[in-house]
Design a protein with these regions (language model features):
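A beta-strand edge to alpha-helix "cap/lid" segment located at domain peripheries
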Residues: 1-133
Length: 133
């Protein structure tokens, strides 16, 4: 089950990069919440931000992944370096991203996506502190 969540998360980064809002709209729960460096908001605003290109998640380099499954909830931590275009400017930031997935009707849906800015980028080749990667 952990591998299924890891694949879904990785696919999600690609869909965000591709601005594939149709697939993302289906993945994000109606009551999903998103936390960014600039604020927090719900599904509709996140989808519109991606669709309109206000934030273009250009490339997420995933360094470490940890997944914990609790009943019908999966909590995934990604340590990433994100290349994004914000307001026409390309920026690169190290983040710990928390993704919460909830199993509904036989499939996993995203309930929350939170970006925590890290003070320093991950060292190349570092091993995760535990979990699955």
């Amino acid at each position: 089950m952990e591998q299924e969540i890891i694949k879904l998360s990785k696919d999600k980064w690609q869909w965000m990069s591709d601005k594939n809002v149709e697939v993302l709209n289906n993945l994000f729960l109606e009551k999903s919440m998103f936390v960014h460096m600039g604020g927090s908001w719900g599904k509709e605003r996140e989808v519109n931000i991606i669709k309109g290109g206000m934030i273009w998640y250009k490339k997420a380099d995933i360094h470490d992944v940890t997944v914990n499954i609790i009943d019908n909830t999966a909590i995934l931590l990604n340590r990433i370096t994100l290349v994004a275009v914000v307001g026409g400017n390309e920026i690169t930031n190290p983040f710990m991203v928390t993704e919460v997935y909830i199993k509904q009707d036989g499939g996993w849906k995203l309930g929350s996506l939170s970006f925590s800015h890290l003070m320093s980028p991950p060292a190349t080749g570092t091993a995760p502190t535990g979990g699955t990667h």
